[in-house]
């Protein structure tokens, strides 16, 4: 039946028999759907997926992690093992032998402390010459981040500051390290590590060499009261 005839039959312009016969014929038997993949135990798309969508070979080098932010790594890098600067009692006994072994054994602890203090004082003399740039150096031992203002004021006045953060928690110590690094950058100074959780803030007009920083760490100047 043509489209025009169908149109006329729909609006009653021609007999409906021909129109109905075509649409009321018995439909052809439908084909039985393919057996589901789960019945055969095989995924019909498995082979095609493997063929068309094969996983590419990735190179580990292309996905190597980048360098972390400097501010996040600063504090972690400062957590290197701390080397003790104490004078061993053996060296003290060999340099200053006692007349009696019994007496030396009974006063061993006191002699070790006194001798260590003498050695520290003797080293501080040539390191911080009177009138030198490090003669007015000061050591601050903050217990929380609230004491950052004191550090900033001392440094702003041109005083070299040693920050001893050993008694602070790691979280507060990291915040104070970030603050001090920004302060040194803003005032064109320098910010250096002396020992584990111990740092030196130097004003712009004071140049502290690597040798001087090493000697500060060896003498344990920051640990003196």
UniProtKB/Swiss-Prot annotation:
Annotated segments matching region Disordered: 21-134
Main location per the UniProt record: cytoplasm
Provide the alphabetized UniProt keywords: Cell cycle, Cell division, Cytoplasm, Septation
GO terms of biological process kind: division septum assembly; FtsZ-dependent cytokinesis
Q: Which Gene3D superfamilies match?
A: SepF-like protein
One GO location term (cellular component):
cytoplasm
Organism superkingdom: Bacteria
Query: Where is there biased composition of kind Basic and acidic residues?
Result: 28-54, 77-86, 115-127
Subcellular location(s) of the protein: Cytoplasm
Q: Name one Pfam family in it.
A: SepF
The cysteines joined by S-S bonds are none
What PANTHER family does the annotation carry? CELL DIVISION PROTEIN SEPF
Subunit details for this protein?
Answer: Homodimer. Interacts with FtsZ.
Name the protein family: Belongs to the SepF family.
Q: Which HAMAP family match?
A: SepF
Per the entry, what this protein does is: Cell division protein that is part of the divisome complex and is recruited early to the Z-ring. Probably stimulates Z-ring formation, perhaps through the cross-linking of FtsZ protofilaments. Its function overlaps with FtsA.
What is the designated name of this protein? Cell division protein SepF
Source species: Rhodococcus opacus (strain B4)
């Amino acid at each position: 039946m043509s489209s025009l005839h169908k149109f006329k039959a729909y609006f009653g312009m021609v007999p409906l028999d021909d129109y109905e016969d075509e649409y009321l014929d018995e439909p052809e038997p439908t084909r039985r759907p393919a057996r589901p993949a789960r019945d055969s135990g095989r995924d019909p798309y498995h082979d095609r997926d493997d063929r068309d969508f094969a996983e590419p070979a990735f190179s580990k080098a292309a996905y190597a992690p980048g360098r972390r932010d400097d501010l996040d790594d600063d504090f972690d890098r400062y957590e290197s093992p701390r080397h003790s600067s104490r004078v061993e009692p053996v060296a003290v006994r060999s340099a200053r032998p006692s007349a009696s072994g019994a007496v030396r054994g009974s006063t061993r602890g006191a002699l070790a402390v006194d001798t260590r203090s003498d050695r520290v004082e003797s080293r501080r003399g040539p390191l911080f010459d009177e009138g030198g740039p490090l003669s007015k150096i000061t050591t601050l031992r903050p217990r929380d981040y609230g004491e950052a203002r004191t550090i900033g004021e001392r440094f702003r006045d041109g005083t070299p500051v040693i920050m001893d953060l050993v008694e602070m928690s790691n979280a507060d110590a990291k915040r104070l390290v970030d603050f001090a690094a920004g302060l040194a950058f803003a005032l064109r100074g320098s910010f250096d590590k002396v020992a584990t959780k111990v740092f030196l803030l130097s004003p712009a007009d004071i140049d502290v060499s690597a040798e001087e920083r090493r000697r500060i760490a060896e003498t344990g100047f920051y640990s003196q009261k």
